[in-house]
Structures are given as C-alpha cells and as structure tokens.
Amino acid sequence: MLDYALQAKIIKSSDGRLSDDNFTYKDWSLGIYDKARNMMTDPRLIYKKESYKRDSLDIFLRKINTYENYKKDSFIDFTDMIERSIDEVDFPPLEILILDEAQDFTPLQWSVIYKMCSKVKRIYLAGDDDQGIYKWNGADPKYFTTYFPGRKVILRKTRRFGEAIHHFSQIIRRGILDSVEKDYEALQKDGAVKRYLNFNEVPIGKLPGTWYILGRVNTTVNELRMCAKDAGLYYGDNRGNRSFDIKQWAAIKAWTKISKNKKINKKEAELMYKYIRELQDLSFRRDKFWHNLPDYQEYDFKGLKDWCGLDLPDESKDKPWWEILQRNFKPEQITYFIRLLKRYGARQLNAEPQIIIDTIHSVKGGEADNVLIYSKTNWPSAFRNKNISEKSDEKRVYYTGVTRAKNTLHILSTDYKYNYPIGSDYFVYLQEKK
C-alpha cells in the first residue's frame, strides 16, 4: 500500500513519516472501497451511506481506478485472495471446522466459509455479537447470530472477571441495539472499577500484573504513549514494538559489558559503533570492515582500540554508556533509558513489557490483569456526532474494551469536545452500587 501511495503521488517521497519503520499508509477512500468489496456491494452505495466523507465521490472513484490499475502489474491484496479463493480453491473435506470470533466475518468472508462447509461434517461457531466491532470493514454479526443454522449454546459464566467489572460492562451493553439476550455470571473474585481525570493519578506499576492502556483511535493512543514515556514507564504495543529503540538498547548493553571488562562479539561491536563518535576513520563504522572479520572473534576495550579503530582514551573505559554513546542518541532518549534502568533494571527491559498501549480493536481477544480505557476520541469517532445505530456500534467498542480486564478497570475521562461519555456510565454504576 505504501508503494502504491508513493507511485500514485498521494504522498510525497519527502514525507518525514517514511523514515519510521512502523509507519503504515492508510487511505480513507481505499478503506471504504475495501469495505464495499467485503460487503459485496457497489462502492458508490457504500460511499453514499458513510456519514463521514473525507474525499469527494469523484476523488473516491479516481483512487479506486488508480489502485486497480496499479495492481495490474502482478500485485494482489488480501481481499483479492479471498475473492479468488471462492472461485479457484478446492477446499479439502474436514471432519470438524471451528470458527472463532465469528461475529467479525464479512459477507465476502462468509462466502468462503459457506464453500468450505459443503465438505465439513460438523461445524462449531464461537463469538459474541456484543463484540462485533468490525462493521467499519463490512462485518455483520447477524450472519453469526441469525443467518447460520444450528443449535445455539450460551455460556453461563465468564472465566475472566468479577462482579464489579461485570456490572459496569452490562451498563454499557444496555445501549447496544439488537443484542442477543444472554445472562452470564461473574466470577467470585475481588475487582474494582475506578475513574480518573489525569493519567498520572492511575496507579500503573503499583498494581501487580499486566496492563492494557487503550484508546479508541491512533491519535489518542499516541497521546497515552507520550504520557507513559513522560512517566518513565516501559511499554509496548500489540505488534511487539517496544517503547524504546532496541538497537540503542543493544548498544547500551554492549558498552556496559566493555566497561565491566567483558568481551562482546562482532555483531554487538558493529552495532555499538553506530552510536560512538570517536573512531579513527569512518570506514570502521561501515559494513565492509566488519564483513571481513571472523564471526567468532570477540573484543574487549583494548581489542577494539588495537584492531577496530576505537579512538577513546584508556580512562574512558570506566565511563557510563551515556557519556560514550553520543551519536544517534537524542537527549530525551538518554533520559528515558536512564529512568527505565533505574525503575526496572536491565533484566526487566530484556523481557517483554507488562504494559501494552494500543487501540481497543488491536487487543480484541486478549486480556490483561488491569485495563485503562481513555474516553477521548476524534471527530469521526465522537459519540454525540453519531446516529442511533452508530452509537450502538460505539457501545460495542467500549464494551469490548472494558471486558478485557481481569482484576481492575480504570477509566480515564476527558472534557475534550470529542469523546465517548464513559463518565455517564460510571455515574450509573455508582448509583446502582448503592
């Protein structure tokens, strides 16, 4: 998609985001086009039904045409593969087919399932229509709850949370239209639901266990990440990215070994040199120099000076890493690493983070001991801007978010003009607790 955007000149090659390895190009019109394909409907009809339109109809159609012409040069996308599988794939016979998260399948994806089912003896569908939060991509929970035949079984007890979180989640669920009636019991365990007006009030790090810190849209997720970084928290996202540069962290660990009279391998030395200014010649930083050295060779401070062009005085060996790694390190990155090491220690920074900060959609299907939900949104996701059906869909999103929590649920409210009124849900919760 990024190559297409560059070729079609939708974004410029000078765009600063291109230097970010995590940057993913997304286009509103192409997203609506993909939704139409998943709904097996004319894109014009889907465009007209959208309450929020970022592009005119003319630009919308031109982007579709440009995208399809781009794909003619031997490119296919994921939706192409699904479409082609309906006509081209001969699915094998199966004894049992188990389909999880069935509420999130689109009509196009159901077409594939129907074809598979013709050769299946027994089929199990699992899902929750109240967590059907992919309508934006054409998903329709009714295929799961209504259209698909068979015996229905409703689970009577959650294995995740206690009464407090269960009660609060049901308050949100009351606003979901066409919800299949289902009563289930909570676990007999302690739990808590609390509300805050400031991120720094939330006891992140003080409560044991894992954390989900969740926002509705990427802009609010980025805001949460900045707050967490300012607080000196170690976190990641649901794609495995960490809150710091792992190459910088590897360089810190390499120099720490050197300063403790230990040796490092060739790979560690080569990476560390990317962050050291004091080299006899720039050639010692290039791949060509390291390529010619044996892989098994290890280096201490003296070896790096004698054979690898390190141009530091002997007394520098005992200096801390932040005085040596002065290249490709911003001051705020150095400060952040120092705070992390003081708070967590190297061993915890080598492990996966206990805190995940991401969108509600990204953690669907997951769970954490503690969950924080941020009510701030942007204009397209603002609750008050939506019609009755769209408000019901927003309720589904927040119901999904709060039911990720196992032990404690934390609500971060905002008076920003675009938001979900989770404070009102919390007020009802307090009134009903009395």
Identify the residue ranges that each predicted region occupies.
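Helicase-core coupling region on the C-terminal RecA-like lobe
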Residues: 170-204, 214-231, 236-296
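Flexible, charged surface loops at secondary-structure boundaries
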Residues: 90-94, 203-209, 403-404
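Conserved helicase motor core of SF1/SF2 NTP-dependent helicases
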Residues: 96, 103-190, 212-227, 238-246, ...
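Accessory N-terminal region flanking or inserted into the helicase ATPase core
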Residues: 9-98, 107-112, 125, 135
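Amphipathic alpha-helical "lid/sensor" segments that cap RecA-like P-loop NTPase cores
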Residues: 21-41, 208-231
